[in-house]
Amino acid sequence: MPEKLQVAIVGSGNISTDLLYKLQRSEYLEPRWMIGIDPESEGLARARKLGLETSHEGVDWLLAQDDKPDLVFEATSAYVHRAAAPRYEEAGIRAIDLTPAAVGPAVIPPANLREHLDAPNVNMITCGGQATIPIVYAVTRAVTEQGGTVPYAEIVASVSSSSAGPGTRANIDEFTKTTSKGVQTIGGAARGKAIIILNPADPPMIMRDTIFCAIPEDVDRDAIAQSIRDVVAEVQTYVPGYRLLNDPQFDDPSINSGGQAVVTTFVEVEGAGDYLPPYAGNLDIMTAAAAKVGEEIAKESLSLAGGAQA
């Protein structure tokens, strides 16, 4: 059976370049193509130096090749991916979407990756979602196991202004809407809210997030704290710089919390510094999570291919 899935990266910007370095370390993925639209792109130049086939002629060029990728990672824009997605599917190419297009189901690795390993297209939601929804999921999991519910969860993502490009700035409303939806549909809260803060501090600060979850007053708080620690450890397997700033904090019901008990969790995300600076943990967690999803898809695909040949 093939040892690795053949991979194309569509997009040649900062996120794509950082992703390339991560994929080069993979035991299951072989980055072979990088596609862009700017012939002078630094990303394409770096990819060529690393031995990849490159083109500035976009998806048309990629799909015209005799050899086609098994898997595409796309970090372009939502409208570009929406146009390309049906073409990938028609060509039998799986897609991991790092844009807001949301053609396929949103995936948060600790929460729902196993449910979507056979999907033709998966979406990586948002950087804030990748950093905070695992915590909401951890709280909901522990509360649900005790017969309760999480009626409300709110996340506040603070990222360095230096790491927020024009795309992020132009899509703040889309970020909050998409992340809020993920807090509910993937995290498991009945209602969700998301806030993003662009921190102008210089030198730049790493990504820091605050996650508030309303919980039943009589729930086992130790079980919630352990569930959070377990999920943090799982995220750390692909984002080593993801960490709790302190133990989860529990507050009894009050007027300020609408009569609900609350657990508050503080996390920070330091990037690996593969290409993006370490303070850009908000971008690093996107590329690391995408690489994690790709590896799990590859493991599943290669295992099935091996079984069919046996």
UniProtKB/Swiss-Prot annotation:
<dbReference type="InterPro" id="IPR015426">
    <property type="entry name" value="Acetylaldehyde_DH_C"/>
</dbReference>
<keyword id="KW-0058">Aromatic hydrocarbons catabolism</keyword>
<keyword id="KW-0560">Oxidoreductase</keyword>
<feature type="binding site">
    <location>
        <position position="282"/>
    </location>
    <ligand>
        <name>NAD(+)</name>
    </ligand>
</feature>
<feature type="active site" description="Acyl-thioester intermediate">
    <location>
        <position position="127"/>
    </location>
</feature>
<dbReference type="GO" id="GO:0008774">
    <property type="term" value="F:acetaldehyde dehydrogenase (acetylating) activity"/>
</dbReference>
<feature type="binding site">
    <location>
        <begin position="163"/>
        <end position="171"/>
    </location>
    <ligand>
        <name>NAD(+)</name>
    </ligand>
</feature>
<dbReference type="InterPro" id="IPR000534">
    <property type="entry name" value="Semialdehyde_DH_NAD-bd"/>
</dbReference>
<dbReference type="GO" id="GO:0051287">
    <property type="term" value="F:NAD binding"/>
</dbReference>
<dbReference type="GO" id="GO:0009056">
    <property type="term" value="P:catabolic process"/>
</dbReference>
<protein>
    <recommendedName>
        <fullName>Acetaldehyde dehydrogenase 1</fullName>
        <ecNumber>1.2.1.10</ecNumber>
    </recommendedName>
</protein>
<keyword id="KW-0520">NAD</keyword>
<dbReference type="Pfam" id="PF09290">
    <property type="entry name" value="AcetDehyd-dimer"/>
</dbReference>
<feature type="binding site">
    <location>
        <begin position="12"/>
        <end position="15"/>
    </location>
    <ligand>
        <name>NAD(+)</name>
    </ligand>
</feature>
<dbReference type="InterPro" id="IPR036291">
    <property type="entry name" value="NAD(P)-bd_dom_sf"/>
</dbReference>
<comment type="similarity">
    <text>Belongs to the acetaldehyde dehydrogenase family.</text>
</comment>
<dbReference type="InterPro" id="IPR003361">
    <property type="entry name" value="Acetaldehyde_dehydrogenase"/>
</dbReference>
